[in-house]
A protein has these predicted regions:
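Short aromatic-enriched loop/helix-cap "lid" or pocket-rim segments at secondary-structure transitions
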Residues: 58-62, 106, 201-204, 254-258, ...
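Aromatic-lined glycan-binding groove of carbohydrate-active enzymes
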Residues: 229-283
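Hydrophobic faces of well-ordered beta-strands that scaffold small-molecule active sites
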Residues: 47-51, 91-93, 130-133, 159-161, ...
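Aromatic-anchored helix/helix-loop segment that forms the rim or "lid"
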Residues: 216, 223, 266-299
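Short, surface-exposed connector motifs at secondary-structure boundaries
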Residues: 126-131, 155-157, 238, 280-285, ...
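Active-site environment of divalent metal-dependent phosphoester hydrolases
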Residues: 54-56, 99-101, 138-141, 167, ...
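Mid-to-C-terminal alpha-helical segments outside catalytic/metal-binding sites
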Residues: 2-45, 49, 56-63, 67-90, ...
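Active-site gating/metal-coordination segments in enzymes
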Residues: 20, 89-232
Length: 354
């Protein structure tokens, strides 16, 4: 698909994509034909729920640095080339929250710029991109208003959030206006952790292995989801839909222990949740991306949550899995309908992609 500079020049003003310069990550995608993903002779629409970006003008409002270690800025042709090579038809763009400590006025300005730029870009290439809105969750009523505007006026398809808000849990009742608005709008929330920053401050995640990411990210997701279950947030907002990055962290693998605590230490639980924690994995409120690392891990996630709760994610531009579509196609034991749902069918329904 050739990309016209005239077509995207206006939309790209102020919008940058992050790329990864982690060394020998394989050859760059060649400018070739767009890969079409086929399952049993049927062309499948593929949707990547987990794709990063940033809006420089928004970051400049609070002097957030753009060139963090290990990142470079790619142009849209690079991104399209990688999508085409991998067989990804759509990316759902999201921005990891770096503004959760900003004052109200700065946060309002930042989010306005950010959401409008995302909407401009997606409008220029509606056949390849949709985007999650951003919001200043540290100011919950403002965040609810920002979300309403972003969805109703700008056409953004959901909301991206962190795994906590400046050290506060998402299950804190102060954030209820945001969950109420998301439920009212019927949109999907994409939750991406920010590396267990409060734990990182202790120094326990220092040293080799990039532990703030390697275990910090899935740990923060596990903590956030557990609080949303045990503090009753999912019960209070039964229409809430959350997709958790990185396969939902450790929760799907250890949810049975969360069930067991209800009977082992009943005096430490309640009055909510209304169901066993393992039921929340399957009951339609929680979704999980496919950033897992073996077919067996994916099969376990699907067993614990149900195939309808699992959605293709690539973590673009970070090369955790260089063949994300083939990763799904190669999982043994799935039906054709299962593969189609994971690759894009479920995400297309949640994000309103025709």
């Amino acid at each position: 698909m050739p990309i016209s500079g005239d077509l995207i020049a206006g939309a790209l003003a102020g919008l940058a994509f992050v790329g990864c310069s982690l060394g020998n990550t394989g050859p760059a995608p060649s400018a070739g034909r767009r890969r079409e993903v086929v399952v049993n002779g049927k062309r499948v629409k593929t949707v990547d729920i987990h794709a990063h970006t940033i809006v420089p003008e928004a970051a400049a409002v609070i002097n957030h640095p753009l060139e963090a270690p290990g990142l470079l800025w790619s142009n849209v042709s690079d991104r399209i080339a990688e999508m085409d090579a991998e067989g990804v038809d759509y990316e759902a763009l999201s921005i990891n929250p770096y503004w959760y400590r900003a004052e109200r006025d700065a946060a309002a300005e930042l989010i306005k710029i950010q959401n409008e730029k995302l909407a401009e870009f997606c409008a220029a290439m509606p056949d390849r991109f949709v985007a999650f809105a951003t919001a200043a969750l540290q100011h919950p009523q403002l965040a609810a208003e920002q979300l309403d505007y972003a969805v109703k006026r700008l056409g953004l398809r959901g909301l991206s959030i962190g795994g906590s808000v400046a050290g506060e849990e998402l299950a804190n009742p102060k954030f209820n206006p945001v969950w109420a608005k998301a439920e009212e709008l019927g949109i999907l929330i994409f939750m991406h952790p920010t590396g267990s920053r409060e734990l990182a401050a202790s120094g326990r995640l220092d040293g080799s292995g990039l532990l703030t990411n390697t275990i910090g990210n899935p740990l923060e997701t596990t903590i956030a989801l557990s609080h949303l279950i045990f503090e009753g947030t999912l019960d209070r907002f039964p229409g809430l839909k959350i997709c958790a990055a990185h396969g939902g962290g450790f929760l799907p693998s250890y949810a049975a222990r969360s069930d067991a605590v209800i009977t082992t230490f009943p005096d430490r639980v309640g009055p909510l949740p209304k169901k066993r924690p393992t039921q929340y994995l399957k009951d339609g409120q929680l979704y999980f991306d496919t950033i897992m690392f073996t077919g067996e891990a994916m099969r376990h996630l699907i067993t614990e949550s149900g195939v309808g709760q699992v959605i293709l994610g690539t973590d673009y531009p970070f090369p955790w899995n260089k063949v994300p579509v083939d990763h799904i196609l190669s999982i043994p034991g799935l039906s054709d309908d299962d593969r189609i749902a994971i690759l894009g069918g479920t995400a297309a329904k949640l994000l309103g992609i025709d």
